[in-house]
Amino acid sequence: MVLWIGVDDTDSLQGMCTTFLATEIVRELTDDYDLIGYPRLVRLNPNIPWKTRGNGAISIRMGRGRGPIQTLGGIGGRPVRSYLRGDSPRDVKDLVAKVARCVERLSRFEDPMTNPAFVVLNKPAAPSLYWKAVRGVVGQRTALAAVRGRATVRRYKSGRGVIGACAATAWRPRDRTYEVLTYRHPDRWGTERWIDPDSVIRMDRRFPSTFNNYDYENERVVIAPHSPCPVLFGIRGDDPSVLPAAMATVNGEVPDRWLIFETNQGTDDHVSPHSAPQAGTTVRIRGDVRSAPRVLPGGHVVLRIGDMDATAYEPSKQFRTLVKALDVGDRVQAIGAVRRLPWTLNIEKLNVEFVALVQRKVGNPWCARCKRRAKSTGHKQGYRCPRCRTRFPMSAGTFVQVERKLKPGWYEPPVGSRRHLSKPLKRMWLEKAETLVESRRSSERSTLELRDLAEFRDPGPDTAARPTR
């Protein structure tokens, strides 16, 4: 067995990054211990109100390595190498002391919202803890109970970071992505980053397995954060083998160090399946549009889907144009976070399943007896001839069909407006393509097996093998 290290809640809005602390832990430990597998960046419930930024915790496995070796990064001019498998190190106390020094040296203790913690486990927490933490709210007692008897725990201040630290070790990937994170020289922290946008565009087009690199709709580089943290840029993708080359394609400020993380970003792990909407969760709702979209002050667009309001907020940019194109009768599936005040679904992705026929009234019905137009008797109350008082139903008006450009299919906000955990449509299409290819391969294998079976002939007793002379 290897040792599992989990760390969380060390950064703040004013600086630091828990992944940078991970690089320091790796640098401190790899003189005496071996890195096993990829370090992990595990995003948890994005709707937690007390999160600092992206609600990401880290998990690192250390031990005595064995098996194949791969290079995952570079720190201090030295390559970071990782083993596929490993055994437990002998000196656990020394490892704990080194992790503690890193956490205590780099955590932003002065920030009232920062409450660091770390755990060192001889066995990771059960996967159920991860699913609770990525989809709901977990307390410290629950997290500590999940690692009781197998952990060294250090909590600082309120110790709230122990929740993410334990949950990060509990992640067993059903789906995964990777991110190569590059970091700035310490003397440049807090200054403006310089990254050549054209090189980011070239990288995005050259490496199709990467995603969320550049916002073409708003002409904005997305791989670089805007906070004063140590991160220079990060490139996310499905194939970790291409990430070093993708990193080298980006021109600009020279990184001080880099490291590839295995992550749950872009997986939709935060979406609760088959659950009723609850505040602070991310759910999937399906229903008919029951009210025409309306624009609120600030540019937010709200409409009613089934029995719930759904909103495309201003930061979703051009995505609001799609939402405004919906109309009563359209059938949609929406994925989003449930807000308590106001009670609404903050739309992350939208699947238009059916586009309704929409008609617009261009005239009131004609009274054939009086040769004049009938008048409306009120909202949805029909019509009445002002002379002979003959009544007409609503359907008697003159209508024309409205041309609608909206097409069925999935839609998402621009690259720069997406959440860390939200699965990009690009990944959804890739998964569907892979499933289709595998289905065809299975079909071809089945066809070959049937063909082989048809060609098989039982030799029978007359053609039994005879002894050779």
Stretch-by-stretch model annotation:
Residues 69-276:
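Long, hydrophobic alpha/beta structural blocks
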Residues 241-299, 322, 351-361:
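OB-fold nucleic-acid-binding modules
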Residues 284-290, 328-343:
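Flexible glycine-rich surface loops and low-complexity tracts that mediate binding to linear polymers
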Residues 291-316:
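OB-fold (S1/OB) nucleic-acid-binding surfaces
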Residues 317-333:
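Short nucleic-acid-contacting surface segments enriched for D/E, G, S/T with interspersed K/R
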Residues 337-366:
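OB-fold/S1-family single-stranded nucleic acid-binding modules
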Residues 367-370, 385-388:
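Short cysteine-rich clusters marking metal-coordination/redox-active sites
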Residues 398-469:
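Long, charge-rich boundary regions
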